[in-house]
């Protein structure tokens, strides 16, 4: 432990979908410097999305060098590296050369849809849900691995001989940073592959057989907070978590019933369920997060399709606002939405409805409705959808929501945060540090090497900037929410199904 006493910094590598970032934290968890580098998105066909793994590694290395230079630090002052990454994105490379045999297939890519349809036809939905906690979807890594092995000649045979390696982005980066010495992933990333038994915490042989994926190519799976190996310059790599789970840990949601919402284009909600892997009756995913010391804790995950994108629609298509920041001002000009509800089912409805045939609608229009009411209804829709998901999570888990921690771009909107607290009837806690994903990776790495000694010490670092307390009567809250549920019901099943056209 003494070695870390002279090393006062931790570097978090945040490898995202559109850019690589490096953030250096000091012992008080303050950001000392950050560097960011975007990379190319490849769209070879409609619905296909790829990245160049070598470019990801190059941008991530460059960011690390740049962040160190900006802070005037040398690598021997860094106590550890923590890694957080875009989840599910799949890389296969040669063990001997470290060269990928194909581009990385990104989580958004839909090319393996037919493979997933076949899994459904084979009656595997219940088995996959029970074993991996996931639904059958091209989103997850398993079908992407099969697609590469099916389409790159000779690759399956080479994988059987141990010549090829599979990894999600964390695994790929660690392999490169350690000079090909360490082939490892953590439980949070493994839980997103559709190949991992989340109960036994082992790769699932039946899923490997079904998808014809040789076990020889899979990484070892370890806890999210331990020393996995060292970079070529000798820095311990000591923390790994997928981006949403890293944010959950960075928000210190380590006890059952603690939840966070990341408000982005859509919303990502995760609720810690502790030692209990809860099977959802509402289409939530059962996934692995981190407990107080980075050990396995289970979580429920739900996604809202249209959050910030609803505000973008007001700005870009309807031209009602010039800037997303203006919504707070306009929403505050009226005392309520005047009975207006906007259901932003532009691409159908996500959790807990899962209705691809729903379409967006505005309800409750009268001659007295102004632009301000519509803008307010758009913001309120984000809070209502968040409640939809959190209510379902509470029903599934039997855990009462203790409070909601929030991060992402929209948390700067005080109107939205206050309305969120009102409609949930619970505290909404906004952290001072907005870099919660990177902070989670730094916390996990720091705990592993004794840079930070305890959870209490971390809690003191994860400072809450503002708490929004519910200010509305329960009867009024439930009346508003009943109106939302009525509006949602009327958007359902709008689009004709294929066989009806």
Swiss-Prot record:
Binding-site positions, glycerol: 87-88, 139, 243-244
Keyword ATP-binding attached: yes
UniProt KW keywords: ATP-binding, Glycerol metabolism, Kinase, Nucleotide-binding, Transferase
Reaction equations catalysed: glycerol + ATP = sn-glycerol 3-phosphate + ADP + H(+)
Name under which the protein is recorded: Glycerol kinase
Stored CDD domains: FGGY_EcGK_like
Gene behind this protein: glpK
Keyword NADP carried by entry: no
List of residues binding ADP: 17, 21, 265, 308, 409, 413
Record comment: activity regulation: Inhibited by fructose 1,6-bisphosphate (FBP).
Annotated positions binding sn-glycerol 3-phosphate: 17, 87-88, 139, 243
Pathway named in the protein's UniProt entry: Polyol metabolism; glycerol degradation via glycerol kinase pathway; sn-glycerol 3-phosphate from glycerol: step 1/1
Binding residues for ATP: 17-19, 265, 308, 312, 409
GO function term, MF aspect, one: ATP binding
């Amino acid at each position: 432990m003494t070695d870390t006493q002279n090393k006062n910094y931790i570097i978090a590598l945040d490898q995202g979908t559109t850019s690589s970032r490096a953030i250096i934290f000091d012992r008080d968890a303050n950001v000392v410097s950050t560097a960011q580098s975007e990379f190319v998105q490849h769209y070879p066909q409609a619905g296909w999305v790829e990245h160049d793994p070598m470019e990801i590694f190059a941008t991530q290395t460059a960011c690390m060098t740049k962040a160190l230079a900006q802070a005037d630090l040398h690598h021997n002052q860094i106590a550890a590296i923590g890694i957080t990454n875009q989840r599910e994105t799949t890389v296969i490379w040669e063990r001997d050369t470290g060269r990928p045999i194909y581009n990385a297939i990104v989580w958004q890519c839909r090319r393996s849809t037919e493979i997933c349809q076949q899994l459904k036809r084979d009656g595997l939905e219940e088995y996959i849900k029970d074993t991996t906690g996931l639904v059958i979807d091209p989103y997850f890594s398993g079908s992407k691995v099969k697609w590469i092995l099916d389409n790159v000649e000779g690759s399956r045979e080479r994988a059987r001989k141990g010549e090829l390696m599979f990894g999600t982005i964390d695994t790929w980066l660690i392999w490169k940073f350690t000079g090909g010495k360490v082939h490892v992933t953590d439980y949070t990333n493994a839980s997103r592959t559709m190949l991992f038994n989340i109960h036994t915490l082992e790769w699932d042989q039946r899923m490997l057989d079904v998808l014809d994926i040789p076990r020889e190519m899979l990484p070892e799976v370890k806890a999210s907070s331990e020393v996995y190996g060292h970079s070529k310059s000798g820095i311990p790599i000591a923390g790994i978590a997928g981006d949403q789970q890293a944010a959950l840990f960075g928000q210190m949601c380590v006890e059952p019933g603690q939840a966070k919402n990341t408000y982005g284009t859509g919303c990502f909600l995760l609720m810690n369920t502790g030692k209990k892997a809860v099977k959802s009756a509402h289409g939530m995913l059962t996934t692995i997060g981190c407990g107080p010391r980075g050990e396995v804790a289970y979580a429920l995950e739900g996604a809202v399709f249209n959050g910030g994108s609803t505000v973008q629609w007001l700005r870009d298509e309807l031209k009602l606002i010039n800037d997303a920041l203006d919504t707070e001002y306009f929403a505050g000009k009226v005392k309520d939405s005047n009975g207006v509800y906007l259901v932003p089912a532009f691409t159908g409805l996500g959790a807990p409805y899962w209705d691809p045939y729903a379409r967006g609608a505005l309800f409750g229009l009268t001659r007295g409705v102004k632009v301000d009411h519509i803008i307010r209804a758009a913001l309120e829709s984000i809070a209502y959808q968040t409640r939809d998901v959190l209510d379902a999570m509470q029903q599934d888990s039997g855990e009462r929501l203790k409070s909601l921690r929030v991060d992402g771009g929209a948390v700067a909107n005080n109107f939205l945060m206050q309305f969120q607290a009102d409609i949930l009837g619970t505290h909404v806690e906004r952290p001072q540090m907005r870099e919660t994903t990177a902070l989670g990776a730094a916390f996990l790495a720091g705990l592993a090497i004794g840079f930070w000694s305890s959870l209490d010490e971390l809690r003191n670092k994860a400072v809450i900037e503002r708490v929004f307390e519910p200010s509305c009567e329960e009867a009024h809250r439930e009346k508003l929410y009943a109106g939302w549920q009525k509006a949602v019901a009327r958007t359902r099943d709008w689009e004709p199904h294929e066989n009806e056209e």
